[in-house]
Design a protein with these regions (language model features):
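Non-catalytic cell-wall polysaccharide-engagement segments
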Residues: 20-28, 105-223, 356-379
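A structural signal for short beta-strand/turn segments enriched in small hydrophobics and glycine
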Residues: 222, 256, 262-264, 295-308
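Zn2+-dependent peptidoglycan hydrolase active-site motif and core
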Residues: 250-291, 310-325
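Short glycine/threonine/proline-enriched tight-turn/helix- or strand-capping micro-motif at secondary-structure
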Residues: 202-205, 209, 220-258
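N-terminal export signals and maturation junctions of secreted/periplasmic proteins
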Residues: 19-62
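Acidic, glycine-rich catalytic/binding loops that coordinate metals and/or anionic ligands
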Residues: 206-210, 250, 299, 320-379
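Bacterial N-terminal signal peptides
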Residues: 5-15
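Short, functionally critical alpha-helical segments immediately adjacent to catalytic or ligand/cofactor-binding
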Residues: 64, 68-88, 118
């Protein structure tokens, strides 16, 4: 069975266009794939592992970090581990199994490496991308025999079609996964449900709702918009911001601030999220000295953390970084949100290019008749 097939049974009953995932034109989450805010605050990963799989407790932060970073449900990922290797319920675990918890779903070695890889693959299957006349938009390649699916079918670049046997096997995998998910978490696995289509413009947070994620009165450098992973061109949900300085520099007087008031989620020692009103949230990555615990209420402009001043801390669970900065992202109902048209501290963002594109025709900020490209900005 192709690697894509092995992952697709998680997505088999998706009945919405991929674009709807990005723009979030529906009012509530009624599915299990995306890491919802309800799950974020009501499913305690560490407590679950302590009760059900204590041998995996050393990996609690890895699970929390990459679930938060990919915005894929940790329950889905844990169920995948159990389906592929039985690692959650094994009483005695061989070292080789800990190295390959997802089995053939990943060709990486190591628990953290496979967890990150599979979380990223699932996210990429949701956020399928294409370019049309230089503007990124979601697309779906639909096999008519797979009713209602909008999924990328060509991850292994071998064949776009499906045989009847493959479709039957995928349906069996779906049933098996659904039963396993219920057995592990005592709740149903709920696929995406299509909501009434809204062809109007994207819902936007009102001007004034979000501020730059640094203290009022300060000026930070802002680079080109990019996807959360840093590759591709949609959704351009993220910005890198910094006050300068290299590894080892003093960052203890440099503060990352909350873009709006909300409830705090500490995903790991270097990654946090604040859930705001009306389905919005903002994430903050490459941090040290995080000031709050999960569940805390924070105010707009309040201190979140310092930019990490060592590469090891900035990448506390892996990834890439070239120096102290914060990686800031916007989400809507748990999904990464395209920044084009969004406002930060009254500045309207235009982002119609690709990741890290600093061409002034494709990425710029404008406010009260002023506009600028990548560079230093203040509130």
């Amino acid at each position: 069975m192709r690697l894509t097939n092995l992952l697709l049974y998680i997505l088999l009953s998706i009945n919405l266009s991929v674009a709807a995932v990005a723009t979030e034109k529906y009012s509530s989450l009624n599915h299990s794939l995306i890491y919802s805010y309800e799950e974020m605050f009501n499913f305690d990963i560490e407590a679950y592992l302590a009760n059900q799989a204590p041998h995996l407790l050393p990996y609690a932060e890895v699970i929390s970090h990459w679930s938060g970073y990919s915005s894929i449900s940790p329950r889905v990922l844990l169920a995948l581990i159990e389906q592929q290797s039985g690692l959650l319920t094994q009483q005695q675990v061989a070292a080789a199994v800990l190295e390959t918890p997802f089995g053939k779903l990943s060709d990486k070695r190591g628990f953290a490496e496979q967890f990150q890889d599979v979380a990223d693959k699932l996210a990429n299957l949701v956020y399928t991308q294409s370019k049309q006349e230089g503007i990124a938009e979601f697309t779906g390649q639909i096999d008519p025999r797979l009713s209602g699916l909008d999924i990328l079918f060509t991850a292994d670049n071998t064949q776009a079609g499906w045989t009847e046997l493959e479709i039957q096997q995928l349906e069996a995998d779906k049933v098996a996964f659904t039963e396993l998910y219920y057995r592990l978490f005592r709740q149903e696995y709920l696929p995406f449900k299509r909501q009434p289509d809204d062809k109007e413009m994207q819902v936007q947070a009102p001007n004034g709702f979000l501020q730059f994620p640094f203290p009022l009165g300060q000026s930070w450098h802002i680079g080109g918009a990019h996807t959360n992973t840093g590759s591709g061109s949609y959704p351009l949900s993220s910005l890198d911001m910094s006050m300068g300085g290299g590894w080892g520099s003093n960052q203890y007087n440099t503060w990352v601030s909350a873009s709006a008031a909300g409830q705090f989620k500490r995903h790991s020692s270097c990654f946090a999220e604040i859930v705001h009103a009306n389905g919005w949230s903002t994430t903050y990555y490459h941090l040290m000295n995080i000031q709050h615990s999960t569940g805390a209420t924070v105010n707009k402009n309040s201190r979140v953390a310092n930019p990490a001043n060592t590469r090891g801390q900035a990448l506390c669970n892996g990834g890439q970084s070239t120096g102290p900065h914060q990686h800031w992202s916007l989400k809507r109902n748990g999904s990464w949100y395209h920044l084009n048209g969004a406002y930060l501290s009254g500045w309207r963002i235009t982002a119609i290019g690709y990741s890290y594109d600093t061409n002034c025709n494709r990425f710029y900020l404008s406010k009260n008749g002023w506009w600028g490209c990548a560079g230093y900005y203040r509130h």
